[in-house]
Amino acid sequence: MLNFFAAAPRGYEYALSLELAEFGAAEIKESVAGVYFSAPLNLAYRITLWSRLASRIILVIYKGPCENPEQLYNAAYCIDWQTHFSNKSSFSIDFHGVGGFIKNSQFGALKIKDAVVDRFRDDGCPRPDVARVDADFKIDAHYRRGQITLGINFSGPALHQRGYRSTTGEAPLKENLAANMLVRSGWQQSPKDLLDPFCGSGTILIEAAMMACDIAPALQRRRFGFEHWLRHQEADWQELLAEAKARASIGTKRCEIKFYGSDIDSRLVALAKRNAQNAGVAELIELSVSNALNVTPPVEQGYLITNPPYGERLGNVTSLLQLYYQLGDKLKAEFGGWQVAVLNSDIELLSALKLKADKQMKMYNGALECAFNLYTLHANSTRRLDPSQVLSQGGEVSEVATAFSNRIKKNHKQLSKWAQREGIDSYRLYDADIPEYNVAVDIYLDHVVIQEYSAPKSIPEAVTKRRLTDVLLVLPQAIGVDPDKIILKTRERQKGTNQYQKLDATKLELVTTEYGAKFKLNLKDYLDTGLFLDHRLTRKLVGEKSKGRDVLNLFAYTGSASVHAALGGAKSVTTVDMSNTYLNWAQDNFELNGLKGKQYQFIQGDCLQWIDDCDQQYDLIFIDPPTFSNSKRMEDSFDVQRDHVKLLSALVKLLRPGGEILFSNNKRKFKMDSEALSALGLSITNLDKQTLPLDYKRNPHIHNTWLIQHA
């Protein structure tokens, strides 16, 4: 008997141990990411040829303590390598594990390599060549908790590489993962007609067809690790191959099970057809290009086993939630009597199916932890709900979710008409009106941006996730927006430079109109979009006060107030911001509005330092500083509450007689030091009510605005 380790992804251990037991292996012991077993050589060949779940088969030749480099070297040196491979074969070391004296796998591999070549040399043989890639003979080493296990890669390249796949789709499913899904779903034990409505390149269907046809998964492979092992018995191997070919021929002819697959991507369907042809099961699989939501049951009862798209894989989260909701609706309505199994990494997407799982299992798709849920659909599972009637975990219609839907509809009816009258196409639709749904919803033309506020620590994460799922499910139906045009962001309390950090690089750009001005929006790349909607009336006021005046815009962001000033007839407009990115954006906004000329200046710099250095004066100054900033470009931190008097006293020096300062900020509990400003000879007028747009009336403390003049 020989000792082996069958490596497999985490979560496969139990199913793999059962598979090995069916083969007749002995001394089976589950471990982390694999199973140890014993078997004679002929059975090891059979397992390598027929295992549908294992990733690799390792022949274990040494296992012992290893506390230092010398013990590691001696463990490898004591093995009579000449009896395992020829010095004419190249070799390599696959070393796994770190800890203790093993700081990195390269160190461990190098020690073993030295021991192997030294052993060949000391036995009077020329040393074999070391190959970095594509070695003839591979030594496998595992170090864990002071123990070293040395073995021979018996199977060779990863066993999930069956040999039928030509190329892959964007998110291919490994073959042994598909096989594990078929095993754990119960399909392998009692096979029935099988449907995969998200078939991609066909892996689930092909693996199932190979099972049904008794086709050995490794039958088409061209390379195995044991081929350069000196104890390999070629005659025994060829006998097993001949047996497998005969079984495949008989099984393919006898198979009566049908397999159905579809995908919305015609390119992937064509690829699935080629893969099925390569695997020898093309005649058994019916493939078509179709939206999963249009698929109908091909037979009265069967299995639907699938790996739909999910967040880490493909697609927009809002679109995916809608897809899962509608898929669950369809399954309940049309697939009564079917067994359904779904693999997904996002529990919220699975919950959107609104199906009660018979069983939930954990599987890994590479390093990604996934849930594998099994469902039995009963013939009367046909209840259909409007997405506004989102189900709570208890299974009852959530009253608060319905209230959210009604509020969205009410706000949209009122505000969409108002926005049209105002001459704007971007506005705030909802701002945490209902405390349980702590989000802001903004309309930007035909797109929607949802900003999720950070929930209090007292609310469980599962609850906040479920509520966000409600929001994403309700919105498309409530206001008639395409789910693909909904963008989700998470907004936390802004601190320092965090305010304008980049989030993405997908460049979803639109042009919005505001009182005749045009502005470029970027809905995805940053937390903010390039236009603060709550300052709409403040910008309009800047435009109304700018005619014939020299205007200065500080902390200008994307220059939207500068555009209004220029369109309002300003004599000159100076735009200052620390960020080159936003200054370039401001210049784009000027170009959008046909504004060109030397009278429009764009200056990159620390605004606070620039104020101190400036020797010019202006008639109108608009300043909207951050609540707090400690940018690496600024010498000191800035706090608007602490520093506003100092800031305004410096700013007054830049103000001509008769000039005005429009000062605004977003600190909710900001208190203007009116006494200190009066002492500076300034009069102040609060403009909060005048500059608060209708769409922000529900949040009157969104910003502060003040008109400051010489007394």
From Swiss-Prot:
The record, for InterPro entries, names:
23SrRNA_methyltr_KL, DNA_methylase_N6_adenine_CS, RlmKL-like_Mtase, RlmKL-like_Mtase_CS, RlmL_1st, SAM-dep_methyl-trfase, SAM-dependent_MTases_sf, THUMP_dom
Source domain of life is: Bacteria
Q: Which Gene3D superfamilies match?
A: 3.30.2130.30, RNA methyltransferase domain (HRMD) like (3.30.750.80), Vaccinia Virus protein VP39 (3.40.50.150)
Q: Could you tell me what reaction this enzyme catalyses? A: guanosine(2445) in 23S rRNA + S-adenosyl-L-methionine = N(2)-methylguanosine(2445) in 23S rRNA + S-adenosyl-L-homocysteine + H(+); guanosine(2069) in 23S rRNA + S-adenosyl-L-methionine = N(2)-methylguanosine(2069) in 23S rRNA + S-adenosyl-L-homocysteine + H(+)
A Pfam match: Methyltrans_SAM
- Subcellular location, in the record's words? Cytoplasm
What is the recorded function of this protein according to its Swiss-Prot or TrEMBL entry? Specifically methylates the guanine in position 2445 (m2G2445) and the guanine in position 2069 (m7G2069) of 23S rRNA.
Mind telling me what this protein is named?
Ribosomal RNA large subunit methyltransferase K/L
- Give the organism the record lists: Shewanella loihica (strain ATCC BAA-1088 / PV-4)
Tell me the gene name.
rlmL
